[in-house]
């Protein structure tokens, strides 16, 4: 009798379905003790239980290897050596924490971040958050546009501005090919990206950076030299992207999760393991790129030709860093991998934009139309800068876009931290006190750096530019109120009390379920044992690698 009660307690009750809450009750209330979903899962080997959850983390991690990351890594290494490696370490640790929180939020609530923002905030606030999220998607697409244009320039000697125009068609072609085998296409793209990573690993073993310098850069925070703060913010912006939080919280909804509290907890743990492995690989790649760039460009015996390239190191000219490994074919292989990096990151950006629009506005667009809209907007500044400033101007635009992403981060991060720590949103799955303290501390540290750089950088520029005094006054009148609005918006999101309830206790909120419990009614053994459904069937068509 006691063992029967223990078995019944082991089968937790899942929340009942309510509107968009996508929870399906699976109550075991028969007189017998049928096998519950967790018992069914325990019959599987551990790796077989883990494999169905593989996919979202790796797809999201492609954003950590996009042209924006490559550009900021290359310039950080060329300008500051190993000094900013600690930014990569902290940034990816923070990325792992918040990406796992985004996954937990989706699994536990059955809704993704954009949908929860719509349910929580007043009309004008959620419209503002939607616009900021769309700006983040566009800012993230700018490095992909420029990186693809550089790759086409290297491969076919097409002018950068013409390559920018051609990027509007390249990704549309890639999206069109998905129907012929998305998993094969993603495998090809990932293979090309990791080929470039392998090249940098090989170059790393050739140039042999000093281990003491690398370790010092990783574990001793330091910001010295001209532009170090700006480069650090650009690194953070390239690593921790706002649209990735919306993307990850939605991608996990395409997975089938057992209808039990334990099943939800296991899913969250599996998504954490998958994200941790994917981000660890991304961490090694980013560290190797900075180390190679720093070692080559700061070498005492650097040739005059390489010294000129290091002085203005861009994505276009970075292939010389791989000559020791690839020889004469370095530029071609580098360009192909750069092209793959830009295209794969753009596909993830397209999905993120779809989820943002669907969540905030209940509006869905076809993938090709969504991509074309975003790409056309991103092409405009890229085209203008590439015509006026050439390759160096386009590279500076990548850094600016990464900084914009860093400044945009609080408007996705703060809602995520609040929702994932909220009992009305998450119920028993909310963050522990340790995660709350760590995540908010790191979040406010990044926000503080952004505000400090925004204020000091603008004031420094305002006092040292060559504009007439009247022009400075007009610019100050426009910019200072915007800075105040930025800070006030962060304060509002931080201290506003959440009101919307998304977690539903099945027994307390459904009198019928409680009555069924009292009457001994419940599902059949077969339904109980195999009661698996996608949390979100409307999102289950997202093409993820198996």
UniProtKB/Swiss-Prot annotation:
Its main location: membrane. The chain crosses the membrane at residues 50-70, 83-103, 128-150, 154-176, 187-207, 233-253, 270-290, 333-353, 374-394, 397-417, 433-453, 473-493. GO terms for cellular component: plasma membrane. InterPro entries: NRAMP_fam (IPR001046). It is a multi-pass membrane protein. It is found in: Membrane. GO terms for molecular function: cadmium ion transmembrane transporter activity; manganese ion transmembrane transporter activity. Glycans are attached at residue 371. Keywords: Glycoprotein, Ion transport, Membrane, Transmembrane, Transmembrane helix, Transport. One of its GO terms (biological process) is manganese ion transport. Pfam families: Nramp. Probable divalent metal transporter. Belongs to the NRAMP (TC 2.A.55) family. HAMAP family: NRAMP. This is Metal transporter Nramp6.2. The gene is NRAMP6.2.
């Amino acid at each position: 009798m006691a063992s029967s009660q223990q078995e019944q307690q082991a089968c937790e009750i899942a929340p009942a379905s309510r509107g968009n809450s996508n929870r399906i009750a699976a109550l075991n209330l028969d007189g017998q003790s049928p096998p519950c979903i967790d018992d069914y899962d325990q019959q599987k080997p551990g790796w077989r239980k883990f494999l169905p959850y593989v996919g979202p983390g790796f797809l999201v991690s492609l954003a950590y290897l996009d042209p924006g990351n490559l550009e900021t890594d290359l310039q950080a290494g060329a300008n500051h050596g190993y000094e900013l490696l600690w930014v990569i370490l902290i940034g990816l640790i923070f990325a792992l924490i918040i990406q796992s929180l985004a996954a937990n939020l989706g699994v536990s609530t059955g809704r993704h971040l954009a949908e929860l923002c719509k349910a929580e905030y007043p009309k004008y606030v959620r419209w503002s958050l939607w616009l900021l999220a769309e700006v983040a998607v566009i800012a993230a697409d700018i490095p992909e546009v420029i990186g693809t244009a550089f790759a086409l320039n290297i491969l076919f000697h097409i002018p950068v501005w013409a390559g920018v125009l051609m990027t509007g068609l390249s990704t549309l072609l890639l999206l069109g090919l998905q129907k012929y085998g998305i998993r094969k296409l993603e495998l090809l793209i990932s293979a090309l990206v990791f080929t470039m990573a392998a090249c940098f690993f090989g170059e790393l073993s050739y140039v042999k950076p000093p281990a003491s310098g690398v370790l010092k850069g990783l574990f001793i925070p330091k910001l010295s030299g001209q532009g170090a703060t700006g480069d650090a913010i650009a690194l953070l912006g390239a690593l921790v992207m706002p649209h990735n939080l919306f993307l990850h919280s939605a991608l996990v909804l395409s997975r089938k999760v057992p209808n039990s509290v334990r099943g939800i907890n296991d899913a969250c743990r599996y998504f954490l393991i998958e994200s941790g492995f994917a981000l660890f690989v991304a961490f090694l790649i980013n560290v190797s790129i900075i180390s190679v760039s720093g070692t080559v460009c700061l070498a005492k015996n650097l040739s005059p030709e390489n010294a000129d390239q290091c002085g203005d190191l861009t994505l276009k000219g970075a292939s010389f860093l791989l000559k020791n490994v690839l020889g004469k074919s370095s530029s071609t292989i580098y360009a192909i991998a750069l092209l793959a990096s830009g295209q794969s990151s753009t596909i993830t950006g397209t999905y993120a934009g779809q989820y943002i629009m669907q969540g905030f506005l209940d509006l869905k667009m076809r993938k090709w139309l969504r991509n074309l809209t975003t790409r056309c907007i991103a092409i405009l500044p890229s085209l203008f800068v590439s015509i006026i400033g050439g390759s160096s101007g386009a590279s500076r635009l990548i850094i600016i876009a990464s900084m914009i992403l860093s400044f945009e981060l609080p408007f996705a991060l703060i809602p995520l931290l609040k929702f994932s720590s909220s009992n009305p949103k998450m119920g028993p799955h909310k963050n522990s006190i340790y995660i709350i303290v760590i995540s908010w501390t790191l979040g406010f540290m990044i926000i503080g750096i952004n505000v400090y750089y925004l204020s000091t950088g603008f004031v420094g520029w305002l006092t040292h530019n060559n504009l007439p005094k009247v022009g400075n006054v007009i610019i100050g009148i426009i910019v200072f109120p915007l800075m105040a609005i930025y800070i006030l918006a962060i304060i509002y999101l931080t201290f506003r009390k959440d009101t919307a309830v998304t977690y539903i206790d099945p027994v307390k909120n459904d009198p019928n379920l409680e009555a069924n419990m009292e009457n001994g009614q419940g599902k059949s053994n077969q339904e109980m044992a195999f009661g698996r459904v996608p949390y979100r069937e409307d999102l289950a068509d997202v093409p993820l690698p198996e």
